[in-house]
Amino acid sequence: MVLDSGAQAYDQAPPSPPTSPPSLRHRLKPSDRDGPPLYPWSQSLALPLALAVPPALQPQPEQQPFSQMLLGHRGHMRRSESTYSVNSTGRRGRGTLGRPPPGRGRNPGGGTLRPAASLPHIAKTQRDAGHIASKSPCMLVALRPTNMDRERDKFFQSHYTYNPQFEYQEPMPTAVLEKYCEASGQFIHQAVGIIEAVLEKFGTYEHFEAATGGQLLTKCQIWSIVRKYMQKEGCAGEVVVQLSEDLLSQAVMMVENSRPTLAINLTGARQYWLEGMLRHEIGTHYLRGVNNARQPWHNAEGRLRYGLRPANPTEEGLASLHSVLFRKQPFLWRAALLYYTIHRAARMSFRQLFQDLERYVQDADVRWEYCVRAKRGQTDTSLPGCFSKDQVYLDGIVRILRHRQTIDFPLLTSLGKVSYEDVDHLRPHGVLDNTRVPHFMQDLARYRQQLEHIMATNRLDEAELGRLLPD
């Protein structure tokens, strides 16, 4: 592991302190289809940088997200959807997320004070994302409204009575919009049950976060926890770690200077949540991606040849479970609220959805972002409609928990980016030598006990899951 608390912008080294407040930027991984993330960097680079050249003196290649790094014939590493957030200082290739409306969650310098983990995340537009997006805009970039800031101002000035009229860059990904135009209600009872369990115990989400997240960590404490975690996973020297105060997510993975890089949000690094984030990003996505590169189904042709199912529900479900693994209160709040929001968006206008969410989320800025997330792709939001892709988190969680007693979790990790449903089929064909299983799966009995604890905490009923997902 390489620890880097210096330059936090990834295009070039920081100049003298900016005279204007730093802008914020966040982007989702461009995964509009399920598929295998690959190991996207030369293995010769998976070493500690004992003598690192200062960033200002290095040639600056185009910064790419972890999911887009190309490596010859191997194609690109594509992980299931999650957030790539990069802080910015207004230099080339940087965009401006936009100014949130006055009120909670703003500091005088223009940065957000809202807890990073409480928000969904919206990709930057082609206009905002600059050179990278203009070359090949991903699906999630294309679905971010280009006029979102202006419509947000109108919405808040109307006291939440205006339905935003969104505009998008062209061409719109119509095939993707058609694929995700219908919301599922299969697990709506579970979603509502999880949300209400949190509010019943803590009153509000903000109280839940304060009670279960623990204190914010100092840089030294973060370095110590990250260093120990990387050693546990055998990843020391493979991943560059950087700290930032400008990320909107808890953490982000990307490839910078041909090295896998994990950026951690200083303002969201809480005592009891940091290791969960590391289990999500490193212990799940990273290790499964490394293992996947060794398998004969590491590319699209191989997946077709072996008849593999989509990996995304399993990938995101597993990562989401690992995020809360070993917590005293392992509530699946975010996955449940995203599922609920999309389910309601399919039946409501934007303003109706915003008002409906008030029963669960008081912060207007947070509600706005959940609503925009669910209404992506719509122009006239006075009409019912949704973009349902984010339901994959809870969907994957519930399916894994339903079959938790029969899934071979170490093998599921070793086989790479595959669905739990394909494990038995792939067992004879997997390349298992030198694959990597996260340390928290070594004691499988304890791991399974934690899954039972997650079931109980979130009030998930075994018999009901059996009826919803029969064998």
Swiss-Prot record:
Residues the record marks as active site: 281
Q: Name one GO biological process term.
A: brain development
Tell me what happens on changing residue 227 to A.
Answer: Reduced binding to microtubules
Q: How is the cofactor bound?
A: Binds 1 zinc ion per subunit.
Q: Which cofactor does it need?
A: Zn(2+)
Q: What domain of life?
A: Eukaryota
Q: Which GO terms describe its molecular function?
A: metallocarboxypeptidase activity; tubulin-tyrosine carboxypeptidase
The record's listing under Pfam families reads: MATCAP
Q: Name one GO cellular component term.
A: cytoplasm
> Chief location of this protein?
cytoplasm
Tell me if Transferase is a UniProt keyword of this record.
Answer: no
Cite the binding residues for Zn(2+): 280, 285, 316
* Function statement: Tyrosine carboxypeptidase that removes the C-terminal tyrosine residue of alpha-tubulin, thereby regulating microtubule dynamics and function. Also able to remove the C-terminal phenylalanine residue of alpha-tubulin TUBA8. Recognizes adjacent tubulin dimers along the same protofilament.
Q: Which family does it belong to?
A: Belongs to the peptidase MATCAP family.
Record's comment describing the protein's domains? Metalloprotease with an atypical HExxxH zinc-binding motif instead of HExxH, which interrupts the active site-containing helix without affecting the integrity of the catalytic site arrangement.
UniProt protein name = Microtubule-associated tyrosine carboxypeptidase 1
Gene coding for it: MATCAP1
